[in-house]
Amino acid sequence: MNTTIRPAGGLCLPDKCRVTLLALGDVGSTLLMGLRLLGGDVIRSIGICDVRPGVSERWEFELNQIQSPDAAFLPPVDIIAPEQLFDGDVFLFCASRMVPDTSVTSGDVRMAQYGLNRELAAIYARMAREKNYRGLFCVVSDPVDPLCRAAMRESGLAPAQVRGFGLGVMHARALYYARRDGRFASYLTEGRAFGPHGEDLVLANSVAHYDDALSRELTDKVAHANLEMRRLGYKPYVAPALSSGALSLLALLRGQWHYSSVYDGQVFM
């Protein structure tokens, strides 16, 4: 029997979804690995698309050679053309026209990408509209929340169809600091992340015993953790791709509690 789940707003998805993913850069390829390894219970297959020659072929070749000794089901990966991106149930937008180099170690790196990435998101949002798409349009590229709004406006999709995946890593980073600094330990069991992914993030050290000073300090650490990684000379993409991307998306498909951005009538947050 093909049962359905309802992630939001009455939107129905099959018990095992066809997922399509655009762009296999650092984030997209890492997210893809997470879905292939962990998503066998809720994903039936994954279609991948990248405009760069040889990139899709590389990841189809690599990912389909991953298999556990017990031959457990892992979602097969296949290569698709851009016009096939909206033939599935869940579309993942991981594309970016500009990712700041690791030499950029200050400022709002996420919003710096908005102009060019908005144009790119608009192209695929219009494609979704032309295809009369009925599935989920999931934004993973930065800046997540503004791109969600742009995608919804350009596509005419229902608000329940558009989701942003950026807050999961903020929660995960808060847990990281809470484990390392006892002052933030309450976050481990009582903390919550609110607001958009980026500079306007708000972390509550505890929803039961809120401390404004501690919450503000933790928020500042988490909001700028990406810059700490850049100072080490690396782009911060592994934790976002898995915490915000793969793990949060799989939780949504399983009907479980998770962090993702939804539309409140004015903004995505």
PLM ranges: what are they?
Residues 74-134:
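Rossmann-like NAD(P)-binding element
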Residues 45, 49-88:
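Conserved N-terminal Rossmann-fold NAD(P) cofactor-binding segment
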Residues 1-58:
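NAD(P)+-binding Rossmann beta1-loop-alpha1 motif at the extreme N-terminus of oxidoreductases
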Residues 40-45, 128-136, 156-159:
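Short, surface-exposed connector motifs at secondary-structure boundaries
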Residues 26, 30, 54, 115-119, ...:
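Conserved active-site and cofactor/substrate-binding residues in soluble primary-metabolism enzymes
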Residues 32, 57-60, 175, 243-251:
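Predominant activation on well-ordered alpha-helical scaffold segments within soluble catalytic domains
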Residues 180-269:
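Long, compositionally biased stretches enriched for glycine and/or charged residues
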Residues 139-210:
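Rossmann-fold dinucleotide-binding core
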